[in-house]
Amino acid sequence: SCYNLMQMTPEARQALLKRIYSTTEGYGVSYARISLGCNDFSSTEYTYCDTKGSESDPISNFALYSDENDYVIPVLKEILAINPNLKIIAAPWTCPKWMKVTDINTKNPKDSWTDGHLNPDYREVYAKYFVKFINVMKEKGINIYAVSPQNEPLNKANCASLYMPWQEEAPFVKKLAAQFKKNNLQTKIYVFDHNYNYDKIADQEDYPVKLYNAIGDNFEGSELVVGAAYHDYGGNNSELTDIHNQRPDKELIFSETSIGTWKNGRDLSKRLMADMKNVALATVNQYCKAVLVWNLMLDN
């Protein structure tokens, strides 16, 4: 989206961004979701530390990629100038490949952008990777309001992905919250970030609730683990009410849907009606505090 926006003239881009984000001259959109590293719409697969550093500092090679420097950050700065209260949530599609293993018991390396598990030995290092990202973005004038530990943690097949069932996300979330606390970060953590039907994996049903129960409420940074995020690529949105009823103390947000095609405008009204019913109203009426769609601006 940011690449496409940067292909516009500055005047046209400014007019469009005002139409979307301005609270006085536009729709007042107040939340944006970005990837922490590459996503399935990026120019290529990458993370911010593709080459491992020394054993004493494995993420010493951390650096933002050109996608962020050339497109994402400039666009975010323009949006923030229009709406300074914009909230930004970031999620990784994959960790660096050198942190991946085929399974957490044998810990055999997994040299692939797709699938794999986070090596338990690198949970703390990966948490520090998040901290570096948040601090670097802050230096650029961009505050990261929230993160999720992993985009679609039950999706093994995405071009950039990491399999992270609740049994593995739970201990990582504790490391992540502790690192945020130690570094005086107020960044919120939304767990899960995937479908209503948990990709039909039996022991992953009610993923957020199982994760909350596993980590408990008495650990460093526990107050930063505020809720769960959902997508709608499988299952029924009634799952939102079910999760709320089990843990009414935790927030819910709806963090991703792809709203499909409009057939050059022929199906626009039908599409907008369906999106209002299923994406907007069905989520906020079932306890979601935010609704985000994916992607903002594609060229095809």
Question: Model-derived features: where do they sit?
Answer:
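Short secondary-structure boundary/capping segments
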Residues: 47-52, 103-108, 163-165, 205-209, ...
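Structural recognition of the beta-strand scaffold that forms the well-ordered cores
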Residues: 4, 30-36, 40, 87-91, ...
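Aromatic/acidic polysaccharide-binding cleft in carbohydrate-active enzymes
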Residues: 251-300
